[in-house]
């Protein structure tokens, strides 16, 4: 029989790291034409769940999800059909559920969730605070041009601090009194010469970094009483803050910035490069060359990998730890237009989300490059930003003047189980 063409059987071992779903560790003979659907039926038959409810699994064959026939997958990987094949199965991540639509007066270009709050920034120059249940709490004015990025500095029951950046060439530090529901601009951060597209707060909340169309990366104090070195008395009294550090190296706009740890920053740029900066040395530690302008980049502390969003509809995976930094680990196909935003899950090692100009959000597993796990639909215009900081909620903002909130069923169930 011609197994490679789907005829005949393949010897497989079925493995799982979820011990309560383990099946006997013996070789099984299965048809080469099997797909995920047939493998699900086969494993569930072996398990014979006591409550009778089937479990949805995904199947990893040589570190990549099976998305077609097993024989085609093996052929693509140049794996011998004569060898016993190990197949790892994992419980499928449940589909996030649409929960809410938060309507604004203009494009929503920045979103960031924290606890029960959602912070948004808009093209009408305003910031807004919402509950994750969809209640509007506060509109904040101060910027004089569209807001491009926001991030929380600290948050407790009584107060919150956050930073926003704008096309008005500034970043602003804000203090929010939860009880009185009032927000005050503590400092206006000046130093960039063009719009400020990206902002990120350090893990300890003491500093934040900004990336701008002026190609500069700047690091600022996030402390309330620290206006920056060299700041004149007059500027301090007026609430103006200057940067602690300015780093030069990109040739075009810095579209993404993220703290990798307390002394390391990641930036992505329209100049087709990713750069890893060592702040203790005030210089570039690693540079990764890509073949497209980078619109967004996200680093995972769980797997140490970087995923990027670009102008060619694709997402790409990189490892900054290797000497072959320019080599793409994987390319993810699924969007039909520019991918504007991307972010790793903060709790799920292999999962990330993306938002694009095709009006769609997608939830991905980095081991499934051929297709996303789920399409998260709802936006009527292009997606401008996406956030998964709160494990329970995927939040996105778009040119349809709305924020879409999707609830992660797995995170909600896990939080209930720990109570």
From Swiss-Prot:
GO MF terms held by the record: ribonucleoprotein complex binding
Main localization, broad class: nucleus
Pfam families: NLE (PF08154), WD40 (PF00400)
UniProt cross-references to SUPFAM superfamilies, sorted A to Z: WD40 repeat-like
Cellular compartments annotated: Nucleus, Nucleolus; Nucleus, Nucleoplasm
Example GO BP: maturation of LSU-rRNA from tricistronic rRNA transcript (SSU-rRNA, 5.8S rRNA, LSU-rRNA)
Record keywords, A-Z: Nucleus, Repeat, Ribosome biogenesis, rRNA processing, WD repeat
Region Ubiquitin-like (UBL) domain, annotated ranges: 10-91
Keyword rRNA processing annotated: yes
GO CC terms of this entry: nucleoplasm; PeBoW complex; preribosome, large subunit precursor
Start and stop residues of the WD repeats: 103-141, 142-184, 191-230, 249-287, 289-328, 334-374, 378-416
Disulfide links within the chain: none
InterPro entries in the record: G-protein_beta_WD-40_rep, NLE, WD40/YVTN_repeat-like_dom_sf, WD40_repeat_CS, WD40_repeat_dom_sf, WD40_rpt, WDR12/Ytm1
Role: Required for maturation of ribosomal RNAs and formation of the large ribosomal subunit.
Family: Belongs to the WD repeat WDR12/YTM1 family.
Name assigned to this protein: Ribosome biogenesis protein WDR12 homolog
């Amino acid at each position: 029989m011609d197994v490679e063409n789907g005829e005949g059987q393949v010897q497989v071992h079925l493995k799982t790291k979820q011990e309560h779903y383990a099946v006997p560790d013996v070789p099984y003979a299965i048809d080469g034409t099997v797909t995920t659907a047939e493998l699900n039926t086969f494993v569930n038959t072996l398990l014979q769940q006591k409550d009778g409810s089937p479990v949805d699994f995904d199947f990893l064959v040589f570190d990549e999800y099976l998305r077609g026939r097993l024989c085609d997958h093996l052929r693509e990987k140049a794996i011998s059909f004569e060898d016993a094949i190990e197949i790892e199965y994992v419980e499928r991540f449940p589909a996030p559920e649409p929960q809410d639509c938060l309507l604004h007066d203009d494009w929503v270009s920045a979103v960031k969730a924290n606890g029960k709050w959602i912070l948004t920034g808009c093209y009408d120059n305003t910031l807004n605070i919402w509950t994750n249940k969809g209640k509007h709490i506060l509109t904040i004015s101060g910027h004089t041009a569209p807001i491009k990025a926001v991030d929380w500095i600290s948050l407790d029951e009584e107060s919150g601090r956050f930073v926003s950046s704008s096309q008005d060439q500034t970043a602003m530090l804000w203090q929010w009194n939860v009880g009185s529901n009032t927000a005050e601009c503590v400092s206006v951060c000046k130093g960039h010469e063009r719009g400020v597209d990206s902002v990120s707060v350090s893990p300890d909340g003491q500093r934040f970094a900004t990336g701008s169309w002026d190609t500069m990366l700047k690091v600022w104090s996030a402390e309330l009483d620290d206006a920056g070195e060299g700041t004149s008395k007059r500027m301090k009294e007026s609430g103006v803050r200057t940067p602690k550090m300015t780093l030069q190296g990109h040739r075009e706009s810095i579209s993404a910035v993220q703290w990798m740890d307390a002394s390391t920053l990641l930036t992505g740029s329209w100049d087709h490069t990713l750069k890893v900066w060592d702040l203790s040395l005030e210089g570039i530690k690693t540079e990764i060359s890509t073949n497209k302008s980078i619109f967004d980049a996200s680093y995972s502390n769980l797997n140490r990998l970087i995923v990027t969003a670009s102008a060619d509809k694709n997402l790409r995976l990189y490892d900054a730890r290797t000497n072959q930094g320019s080599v793409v680990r994987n390319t993810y196909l699924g969007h039909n237009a520019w991918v504007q935003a991307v972010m790793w899950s903060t709790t799920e090692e292999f999962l990330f989300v993306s938002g694009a100009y095709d009006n769609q959000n997608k939830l991905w597993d980095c081991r499934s490059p051929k297709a996303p796990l789920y399409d998260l639909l709802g936006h009527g215009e292009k997606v401008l930003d996406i956030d998964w900081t709160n494990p329970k909620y995927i939040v996105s903002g778009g040119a349809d003047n709305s924020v879409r909130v999707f609830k992660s069923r797995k995170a909600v169930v896990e939080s209930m189980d720990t109570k």
